């Protein structure tokens, strides 16, 4: 009886979380069927998931396609490991940053947009901006 009550409570809590516009996940097993029908599609260069500073859970902000939420289990989509992800393959989609004084990532409200890729980032964002800690030393970074 206690086990079935735990299952019922878990289902209820998951349903409540997933009815918000963005949702938090503790692992990489994301399925587009978990999302509400009105969950937004990602915009150009928008980060699809970013780790919450409060909980360390990934907060998913948008879906990459009708069938894909956000490829958080693939390092080739990681802007910053275990912290930020983009729908596209990082190395083939983003140019390397060339100046550490220009923001690599800009955030407004709850939308993170990446302009270029760095080797390492000054994370978390300060004042809505993330700068490179070190510039990309090679054209294609291998994970």
Swiss-Prot record:
Residues 24-32 form a propeptide. Contains 4 disulfide bonds. One of its GO terms (molecular function) is toxin activity. Expressed by the venom duct. It comes from the Eukaryota. One of its GO terms (cellular component) is extracellular region. Disulfide bonds: none annotated. Its main location: secreted. Keywords: Disulfide bond, Neurotoxin, Secreted, Signal, Toxin. It is found in: Secreted. Residues 1-23 form the signal peptide. The cysteine framework is VIII (C-C-C-C-C-C-C-C-C-C). This is Turripeptide VIII-01. It comes from Gemmula speciosa (Splendid gem-turris).
């Amino acid at each position: 009886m206690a086990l079935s009550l735990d299952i019922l409570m878990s289902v209820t809590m998951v349903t409540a979380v997933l009815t918000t516009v963005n949702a938090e996940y503790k692992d990489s097993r994301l399925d587009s069927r978990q999302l509400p029908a009105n969950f937004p599609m990602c915009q150009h260069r928008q980060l699809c998931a970013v780790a919450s500073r409060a909980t360390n859970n990934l907060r998913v902000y948008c879906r990459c396609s009708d069938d894909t939420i956000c490829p958080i289990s693939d390092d080739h989509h990681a802007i910053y490991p275990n912290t930020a992800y983009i729908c596209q393959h990082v190395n083939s989609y983003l140019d390397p940053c060339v100046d550490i004084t220009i923001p690599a990532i800009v955030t407004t409200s709850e939308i993170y947009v990446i302009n270029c890729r760095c080797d390492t980032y000054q994370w978390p964002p300060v004042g809505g901006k993330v700068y490179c800690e070190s510039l990309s030393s090679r054209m294609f970074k291998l994970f």
